[in-house]
Amino acid sequence: MLFTLAWASLAAVFSFSIAMVVWGRNGDGTLNF
């Protein structure tokens, strides 16, 4: 249970960071990195 929860949170953070990079490069200009 604890391992599954930790893995899910890790996957969520990883996916979010990837999304931020993509939005930063291909965004509408509101996110400027």
Swiss-Prot record:
Q: Name one Pfam family in it.
A: PetN
Q: What domain of life does the UniProt record list for this protein's source?
A: Bacteria
Query: Which cellular compartments is it found in?
Result: Cellular thylakoid membrane
- Gene Ontology terms: biological process: cytochrome complex assembly; photosynthesis
Name one cellular component (GO) term. Answer: cytochrome b6f complex
Which residue ranges traverse the bilayer? 2-22
* Family matches, as SUPFAM superfamilies: PetN subunit of the cytochrome b6f complex (SSF103451)
Task: Describe its membrane topology.
Answer: Single-pass membrane protein
Which keywords does this Swiss-Prot/TrEMBL entry list? Electron transport, Membrane, Photosynthesis, Thylakoid, Transmembrane, Transmembrane helix, Transport
Q: Which GO terms describe its molecular function?
A: electron transporter, transferring electrons within cytochrome b6/f complex of photosystem II activity
Subunit annotation: The 4 large subunits of the cytochrome b6-f complex are cytochrome b6, subunit IV (17 kDa polypeptide, PetD), cytochrome f and the Rieske protein, while the 4 small subunits are PetG, PetL, PetM and PetN. The complex functions as a dimer.
Q: What does this protein do?
A: Component of the cytochrome b6-f complex, which mediates electron transfer between photosystem II (PSII) and photosystem I (PSI), cyclic electron flow around PSI, and state transitions.
Family annotation (NCBIfam families): PRK02529.1 (NF002709)
Give the family per the record. Belongs to the PetN family.
Protein's recorded name? Cytochrome b6-f complex subunit 8
Q: Which gene encodes it?
A: petN
